[in-house]
């Protein structure tokens, strides 16, 4: 299986700079970081983010990143894209992440997740939220999905 969870606003691939599953990323750059931390996420030092080549800011404030999620003996690929609006928001909007989840059985489920800008999320938190939504849309074994994405 391929080995990446890609978050991007374009087809840019950042596989040279993998992040760990425990790495927390910012959902939007509209709010200075660090900001509110999700209960399952670990805050990241402000000075550590701008210099990192694996974290690139999109022109409209989204964040592009590559994360690796460990499986038992391999890694599982999921592709995400930021769905953001133009610049000049009068108030911080909600951002949506679209997950294209390639399950181990080769079935595909498309899942949208709405998140608040300025909030820190871990890769595991986002993937678990995607799993819950995907399971409500497409019948599959939860244990099978969990084995593929945990």
Swiss-Prot record:
GO terms for biological process: symbiont-mediated perturbation of host apoptosis. Coiled coil: none annotated. The record marks 127, 135 as: Important for the disruption of the host mitochondrial membrane potential and the induction of apoptosis. It comes from the Viruses. Changing residue 135 to A: Decreased host caspases activity and apoptosis. Residues 93-140 are annotated as: Apoptotic activity. Signal peptide: none annotated. Keywords: Host-virus interaction, Modulation of host cell apoptosis by virus. Induction: Expressed at 72 hpi, barely detectable at 48 hpi. Undergoes active degradation during infection. Disrupts the host mitochondrial membrane potential and induces apoptosis probably by inducing host CASP8 and CASP9. This is Non-structural protein. It comes from Crimean-Congo hemorrhagic fever virus (strain Nigeria/IbAr10200/1970).
């Amino acid at each position: 299986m391929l080995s990446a969870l890609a978050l991007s606003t374009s087809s840019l691939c950042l596989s040279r700079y993998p992040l760990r599953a425990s790495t927390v990323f910012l959902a939007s750059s509209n709010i200075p970081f660090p900001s509110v931390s999700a209960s399952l996420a670990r805050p990241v030092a402000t000075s550590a983010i701008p210099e990192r080549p694996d974290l690139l800011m999109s022109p409209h404030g989204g964040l592009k990143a590559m994360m690796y999620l460990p499986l038992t003996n391999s890694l599982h690929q999921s592709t995400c894209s930021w769905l953001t609006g133009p610049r000049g928001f009068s108030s911080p909007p909600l951002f949506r992440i679209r997950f294209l989840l390639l399950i181990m059985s080769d079935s595909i489920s498309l899942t949208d997740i709405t998140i608040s800008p300025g909030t820190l999320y871990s890769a595991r938190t986002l993937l678990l939220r995607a799993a819950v939504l995907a399971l409500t849309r497409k019948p599959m074994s939860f244990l099978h999905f969990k084995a593929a994405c945990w």
